[in-house]
């Protein structure tokens, strides 16, 4: 039996997307991260005139969760206008907490697809590589 309802996570991500601050790209992203505890942490992208300082929705959700004590995650839903996937930096940050994370990639029309972090970031770098 599945531990979560994909539609609940996708809806939370859609709602988070509405809070995005994207005056430069107009590319609004929302994320909803499900912790092992059952809590959902949301995030949106926050752009900056100095582009490298922009914070992605996925990383916002992770930082919120970790700052509240959550360290284990089940799934994340990411919603964009066109169903774009998480960027490389977000994939790597999510990888820090495990590679079996379910990733739901949705768009504003309600379509989504399901994948895993292992599929999006094969042969990834992890804490085990640092300890060698």
Language-model regions: role of each:
Residues 26-35:
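Short beta-strand scaffold segments in enzyme catalytic cores
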Residues 24-26, 87:
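Short solvent-exposed loop/turn micro-motifs enriched in small/polar/acidic residues
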Residues 13, 31-32, 61, 65:
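Small-residue (primarily alanine) positions within well-ordered alpha-helices
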Residues 1-10, 71:
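Short, compositionally biased leader-like segments
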């Amino acid at each position: 039996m599945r531990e979560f309802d994909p539609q609940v996570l996708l809806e939370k991500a859609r709602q988070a997307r509405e809070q995005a601050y994207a005056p430069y790209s107009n590319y609004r992203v929302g994320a909803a991260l499900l912790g092992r505890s059952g809590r959902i942490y949301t995030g949106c992208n926050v752009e900056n005139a100095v582009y490298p300082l922009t914070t992605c929705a996925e990383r916002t959700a992770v930082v919120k969760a970790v700052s509240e004590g959550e360290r284990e995650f089940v799934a994340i839903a990411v919603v964009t206008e066109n169903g774009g996937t998480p960027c490389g930096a977000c994939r790597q940050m999510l990888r820090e907490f495990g590679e079996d994370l379910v990733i739901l990639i949705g768009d504003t029309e309600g379509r989504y697809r399901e994948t895993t972090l292992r599929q999006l970031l094969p042969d990834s770098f992890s804490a085990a590589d640092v300890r060698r």
